[in-house]
Amino acid sequence: MTTTAHQAAPLIPRQDLFGNPTKAGGQISPDGEWLSWLAPKDGVLNVWLAPSSDPAAAKAITSSDNRPIRQYFWAPDSKSVLYVQDKGGDENFLLYGIDVASGDERTLTDFEKTRAMVMGTSQTIKDKILVGLNNRDARFHDAYLLDLNSGELTLVQQNDAYAGFLADDNLKLRMAVRPNTSGGMDFFPITDGTIAETPSDSTGLEDSLTTQPAGFTTDGKTMYWIDSRGRNTAALIAQNVATGEKTIVAENDKADIGGAMSDPKTGEVEAYSFTYLKTEWTAIDPEIKASLEWLDERLEGEFSVQSRTEDDSKWIIGNDPLTSPTKTFIYDRNAETLTEIYTSRPELIGAPLQPMQGLELTSRDGLTLPSYLTLPPGSDSDGNGIPDKAVPMVLLVHGGPWARDGYGFNSYHQWLANRGYAVMSVNFRGSTGFGKDFISAADLEWGKKMHDDLIDAVNWAIGKGITSKDKVAIMGGSYGGYATLAGLTFTPDTFACGVDIVGPSNLETLLATIPPYWEPMIAQFHERMGNPNTPEGLAMLKERSPLYSAGNIVKPLLIGQGANDPRVNQDESDQIVAAMKEKGIPVTYVLYPDEGHGFAKPENNIAFNAVTENFLATCLGGRSEPIGGTVASSTAEIVEGAQYVKGLEDELSD
């Protein structure tokens, strides 16, 4: 028996891929005096601060001892750092602030069952921000002015109908956004605090996910839009506020304009990006163009500008070399120096990381499906993108579904490829970034044409000799979890096994239990998924719900769920597990009492991945690192089916 190259490649420890990064999320303060990043303190991600002249002098300024801090930002005056945090994954985020000079930390939105959101920041009013709070009515966010020095909250606009507001640099509300009955949006001007009775702009369903205002210039004279009206892909539009005239700033015929760099002082767009298979930047400003070209000459792989000082002299650059761990640099534009601050996961230096291929696949009805493929190490000796012989494959399906997969370092691709699997991610119809027609092609197609796209990708891979018909697993989170359940119920012979993470099993109950602050979007959900208030819509939702076809499942299934998930309630997993048990169908069910829509705590994520790779090893025959105490070190509850995963019963009996 010969040993293949991917079997001989070193096994990358799960901890190295899914444990805490050494550092991540680097930023520079607007005044350029401070560097900040996320790093572990006592095993939990916290915000760290260092003088920009001495990164080695960093110290933790937050003290979260339970859930990792994953989002933070600088106050415009550089005097405080702000972050949001929820409890147990319930997504009721509160806003916290740390005074840089004193180190004092306080809760800025101290309300129960409230989801705080930042509505606006300013270059001219640097000690205040606009925040939205839904503590009065969980469906709608009232707008408040928050004084970052005193902590005082002042009501700016009570909200009884709107999905959101847009503010200018004076922190004045200038536009209100309200869903309409067609599933689109109406945009209402606000003048001196009064919301207009009739909208100045509107979208229908087809433009609802690809058209939105994108902010004002600092002087308030220009408003930017990302806009797909009258076109397919979304363009960047500049609107003269005084005259209403709109001018196209940027467009691309294959992908939506997805990102922009704006002058920190004027707010004028200086560069823009679109992402088809890879992200491409185009500079409008000649000095920005020169800087981006200078960086491109010196950095391998992909890079992005993560943070800029107010005077624009220093940038924080994130660099993804693709087959080595990501790095973060400080770029001094005046001195033309590029200095590494940190490598996020230095333990991956020298690991057998694999390149990702960007592919264009074709669906059975002629749509182009931008996709990504990663092969096991050593499996493709001639480098033609096809393994020398067929290998097992994991179809890794993204969530949303109104989201997308992208190019670059992906810990799941690297992990699964290292275990001996080809890994394919498909931007099926409904994925965002590729124009409104591609999104609309998915309307009312959950479990139908959206699923057909995934099956077409699998058949392509089989036809190319990448994998074999009996060695394909399906795995994903949220919508990807639904796709897994759909795969095992609607096409029960296609996949060898499936891994469902926080996936809905019943579309009717999913729509009935959405978070209250999503209720303004319910008309769009009904138009795109199915309307439970009509007999036809309800029948379709039931037909597309894997729960009602649970008896079709004949292949192994692993389910992971967070008990506090506000989007896909625990009942979505409980229901299908109960239905399978009633029919005597085996299933393994892992529940986390302190998690929500996904697993934020590294020890919980690592534990589930330990179970997953040992589950896949039995199903597909790949390699696996033993479970080795990871489940015991997590909060995982094995509700059902420990006996179906290699080593799991032993772990529980220790």
Where would I find each of the regions flagged by the language model?
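Cap/lid segment of the alpha/beta-hydrolase catalytic domain
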Residues: E347-A473, G477-S478, A483, S505, ...
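Generic beta-strand/beta-sheet core signal
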Residues: A50, I226, Q239, Y272, ...
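Conserved hydrophobic/aromatic "anchor" residues
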Residues: I28, W37, W74, F216, ...
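Short, Lys/Arg-rich amphipathic segments at extreme N-termini
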Residues: A8-I28
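Peripheral, non-catalytic segments that deliver or gate enzyme domains
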Residues: T2-T4, F18-A24, W34, D42-A50, ...
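Basic/polar N-terminal segments that are highly enriched at the extreme N-terminus
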Residues: M1-Q15, D650-D654
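Active-site-proximal cap/loop segments of hydrolase catalytic domains
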Residues: F428-D654
